[in-house]
Amino acid sequence: MTDRLSPERRRYLMQQVRSKNTRPEKAVRSLLHSIGYRFRLHRKDLPGTPDIVFPSRRLVLFVHGCFWHGHGCRIGQLPKSRLDYWSPKIEANRARDQRKEAALAAEGWRVAVVWQCELSDLGALEARLRNILDPS
């Protein structure tokens, strides 16, 4: 199946895909802030430049888009076209995520992932985040 968009238009649209300060990331940050947690953003001195960092808790949060990071939910399903491109791309993203998590764990950091689809139930996400941040 051919792309309905011109190469210039497709390039422009792909350039608009953000890697930092995405809508899901901002929603998680807003939720964390509203329940009283303070954090640091995008620490470049840590492996993988985590989205949200809690230095005193030695905890990092990655906010993953379900499609780009290959989550098993409905949003994370691969497109039906160009599987020869998308399958290796998403698998490479997943492998990179695992390497980043392993490197952080080796440095003594706890790692948690918040998936984009979890934002559909903010109450459950808040409870999960509280449990991660203050395990008792």
Curated annotation (Swiss-Prot):
It comes from the Bacteria. CDD domains: Vsr. Its EC number is 3.1.-.-. Keywords: DNA damage, DNA repair, Endonuclease, Hydrolase, Nuclease, Restriction system. Pfam families: Vsr. GO terms for biological process: DNA restriction-modification system; mismatch repair. One of its GO terms (molecular function) is endonuclease activity. The keyword RNA-binding does not apply. Gene3D superfamilies: VSR Endonuclease (3.40.960.10). The keyword Hydrolase applies. Belongs to the Vsr family. May nick XorII sequences that contain T/G mispairs resulting from m5C-deamination. If unrepaired, these mismatches can lead to C-to-T transition mutations. The very short patch (VSP) repair process counteracts the mutagenic process by repairing the mismatches in favor of the G-containing strand. This enzyme is an endonuclease that nicks double-stranded DNA within the sequence CGATCG (C-methylation site unknown) next to the thymidine residue that is mismatched to 2'-deoxyguanosine. The incision is mismatch-dependent and strand-specific. NCBIfam families: vsr (TIGR00632). This is Type II nicking enzyme V.XorIIP. It comes from Xanthomonas oryzae pv. oryzae (strain KACC10331 / KXO85).
